Amino acid sequence: MLKNDLFIRALKRQATPRTPIWVMRQAGRYLPEYRAVREKTDFLTLCKTPELACEVTIQPVDLMGVDAAIIFSDILVVNEAMGMNVEIIETKGIKLTPPIRSQADIDKLIDPDIDEKLGYVLDAIRLAKKELNDRVPLIGFSGAAWTLFTYAVEGGGSKNYTWAKKMMYREPKMAHQLLQKISDCISAYLVKQVEAGADAIQIFDSWASALSEDDYREFALPYIKQNVAAVKAAYPEIPVIAFAKDMNTILSDIADCGADAVGLGWNIDIAKARKELNDRVCLQGNMDPTVLYGTPEKIKSEAAKVLKQFGQHNDHSGHVFNLGHGILPDVDPANLKCLVEFVKEESAKYH
């Protein structure tokens, strides 16, 4: 039994005495303790060494007092498992070779055995679950098919998603074939993460806003639905968060994907999102990550604003406090600590 299950209860829109908080990229470069581990090895080796991945997963629980841990990994491990060569240089960016741009390229991608190709993530989850000793829940995650598709087709990050869009508009059948292949891998991977001990799942569609509303409904959302359905078919009790960054104009469609919670970027008032979705799902977010560059007073006032905008809870509301995207690497850890402590204290009056 979890000693602190506030995060899980909030995702399920059950009553909680206060609002739980965790932060995307909470295991990361802003922490000197993370940097000390990271200095010994490269980024992907850190992801692939269960003992080290476990250590950095737990750091923010010990140091910051967050209400959930998220397994330390990277969304691109899925691309690598499917046969792509992935290079991640934290300060310089990402390179995937060869880029997937033809039918022959798609045919070469493998349908991986998750235990074999991504066993290191599952081992890290098992280890972290054991080390956490039920203090807080552990989140497993994957990138969404659309986001992983953009990396595969572009061969890295992109401003305009030229190659990805070319395939979408010129060869939509081929695009869907690749998306489906990626989605099948994601579904299997997420189910395996729960099997290994993950208490909740988040699907990150980081590049969601590269698509128009209609294109998002066609090329992204159906695959998120598949991934959520796969988790729910195997583990109906496991809550799932869908984070389609900055797709604020179609929140209702995203809320219909079957996920328990919808993650919000910071460029929407959470009150608007709550009103539109009418407490059909839990909301996660959504303070601007750059607020953590501010003074303690400013951090508290901005956090108070998010809590106030969400407003008073009722019998079927849920809110998980988070940033609208990942914490930035040059933030002072004391500022995150300040945020976590403030949210824990301030949020009680809304419950």
UniProtKB/Swiss-Prot annotation:
> Pathway, per UniProt?
Porphyrin-containing compound metabolism; protoporphyrin-IX biosynthesis; coproporphyrinogen-III from 5-aminolevulinate: step 4/4
List, alphabetically, the SUPFAM superfamilies matched.
UROD/MetE-like
Q: Where is this site: Transition state stabilizer?
A: 74
For this chain, one GO molecular function annotation is: uroporphyrinogen decarboxylase activity
Q: Would the keyword Disulfide bond be found if you checked this record's keyword annotation?
A: no
| Annotated keywords | Cytoplasm, Decarboxylase, Lyase, Porphyrin biosynthesis
State which Enzyme Commission number(s) the record gives: 4.1.1.37
Example GO BP: protoporphyrinogen IX biosynthetic process
Record-listed substrate binding positions: 25-29, 43, 74, 151, 206, 325
Instruction: Cite the PROSITE patterns for this sequence.
Output: UROD_1, UROD_2
Instruction: Spell out the reaction equation it catalyses.
Output: uroporphyrinogen III + 4 H(+) = coproporphyrinogen III + 4 CO2
Lineage, top-rank taxon, reads Bacteria
Q: Does the keyword Cytoplasm apply?
A: yes
Function noted in UniProt? Catalyzes the decarboxylation of four acetate groups of uroporphyrinogen-III to yield coproporphyrinogen-III.
Q: Which family does it belong to?
A: Belongs to the uroporphyrinogen decarboxylase family.
**Assembly and interaction partners:** Homodimer.
Give the protein's recorded name. Uroporphyrinogen decarboxylase
